[in-house]
Amino acid sequence: MTKKLEGAGLRGQVAGETSLSTVGQIEGLAYRGHKIELLAEKATFEEVAYLLLYDKLPNQSELDGYKSLLKSLRDLPDSLKEVLKKIPADAHPMDVMRTGTSMLGNIEAEGDFSNQLHAINRMIATMPSIVTYWYKFSHEDLDIDLVNDEDSMAGHFLHILHGEKPS
């Protein structure tokens, strides 16, 4: 016979505190005080990433600089590409990204917390490259070039996925 547990469960328990997001303080989910619905409608991926990392929405100059930074961090080390080539074609893309970021962390060790912002931006920049490199190699036997002139993450992803500039 099992005993039925009674009570509030975890209701009212604080699991942690963060300034990144809130739920319910301003009608639903917010990132750094900005309603998620407005961000989804009006902001780009890079603007939201900047907001989460730097605690403010970027002005145009800051956004241009941030996009340029991410663009410079997109390429993958050859040793990571070799690992991605070994992942089966039927793997789930989330598993590929987990393996890719884990391997990248071993290749480019963070060392200490003074490098954490660079490591975070490197991971953000490489996610489209990791999953697309694996996909193109495992499904089409193509060893693709990950460098292009697209300034946005979405543009970069679409360009390397389809092999041409997005329209």
Question: What is the predicted function of each stretch?
Answer:
Residues 1-167:
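Hydrophobic alpha-helical bundle cores within soluble ligand-binding/oligomerization subdomains
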